[in-house]
């Protein structure tokens, strides 16, 4: 059965992660999210307090990114950022893995890094960003298996910051690996309704995009990385 606009909207994390995002742009992001009933807005952690105020009593969650976009910070730093973002009003956390550790064969360190943030989140859902454009298929599977074992809420394809975005093949691989219990978030390059529906068909359950309004309106999306 085709998805209605309302159902499609509830798969969307309406996203603005640009380093120069102004307060006015964050307010507009939140206004759009409330109007279209998106699942959440996804913002940098410094913008969580403003977004939380703007979305109070709307039912739209605030999602904060952690260790973004490189994932190369200390685990303790990522955990602190997650804790602080949640205290400021974030209802979901998207973290970037330690990609360098994975490439160096330090899988235990990668898993410990994810676990540290997962513990800091408590009951708040954690999404783990793989940055699939930098990984081999074997590495993608390895991280998805870690996330499945740790019981995080979602695995997520990409940051959308210059290393390639979501692909149907990656979404399908991630879904096969984590099975039916974890969410899969496709992010990076999902800019129109056809792309959104294709990602959902491939196994995604959430979409990270700056083109949410265009997607639910069936228009051409914007040109940002998200």
From Swiss-Prot:
Signal peptide stretch: none
An annotated Gene Ontology molecular function: deoxyribose-phosphate aldolase activity
Which catalytic reaction applies to this protein? 2-deoxy-D-ribose 5-phosphate = D-glyceraldehyde 3-phosphate + acetaldehyde
Instruction: Please report a single Pfam family linked to this protein.
Output: DeoC
For this protein, the Enzyme Commission number is 4.1.2.4
CDD domains, per this entry? DeoC
Q: Per its UniProt record, what SMART domains does this chain match?
A: DeoC
Compartment(s): Cytoplasm
GO cellular-component terms in the record? cytoplasm
Keywords, alphabetical: Cytoplasm, Lyase, Schiff base
Q: What does this protein do?
A: Catalyzes a reversible aldol reaction between acetaldehyde and D-glyceraldehyde 3-phosphate to generate 2-deoxy-D-ribose 5-phosphate.
Give the family, as the similarity comment puts it. Belongs to the DeoC/FbaB aldolase family. DeoC type 1 subfamily.
Q: What is this protein called?
A: Deoxyribose-phosphate aldolase
Native organism: Burkholderia cenocepacia (strain ATCC BAA-245 / DSM 16553 / LMG 16656 / NCTC 13227 / J2315 / CF5610) (Burkholderia cepacia (strain J2315))
Q: Lineage of this protein's species?
A: Bacteria, Pseudomonadati, Pseudomonadota, Betaproteobacteria, Burkholderiales
């Amino acid at each position: 059965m085709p998805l209605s606009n309302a159902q499609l909207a509830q798969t969307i994390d309406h996203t603005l992660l640009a380093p120069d995002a102004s307060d006015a742009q964050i307010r507009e992001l939140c206004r759009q999210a409330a109007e279209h009933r998106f699942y959440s807005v996804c913002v940098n952690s410094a913008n969580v307090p403003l977004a939380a105020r703007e979305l109070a009593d709307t039912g739209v969650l605030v999602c904060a990114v952690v260790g973004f976009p490189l994932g190369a910070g200390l685990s303790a730093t990522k955990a602190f950022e997650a804790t602080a973002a949640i205290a400021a009003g974030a209802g979901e956390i998207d973290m970037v893995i330690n990609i360098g550790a994975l490439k160096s064969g330090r899988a235990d360190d990668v898993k410990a890094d994810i676990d540290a943030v997962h513990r800091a989140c408590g009951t708040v859902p954690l999404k783990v960003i793989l940055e699939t454009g930098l990984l081999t298929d074997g590495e993608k599977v390895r991280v998805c298996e870690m996330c499945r074992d740790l019981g995080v809420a979602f695995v997520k394809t990409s940051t959308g910051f210059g290393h390639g975005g979501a692909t149907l093949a990656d979404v399908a691989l991630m879904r096969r690996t984590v099975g039916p219990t974890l969410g899969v978030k496709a992010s990076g390059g999902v800019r129109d309704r056809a792309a959104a529906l294709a990602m959902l068909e491939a196994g995604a359950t959430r979409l990270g995009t700056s083109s949410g309004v265009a997607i639910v309106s069936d228009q051409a999306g914007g040109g940002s990385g998200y």
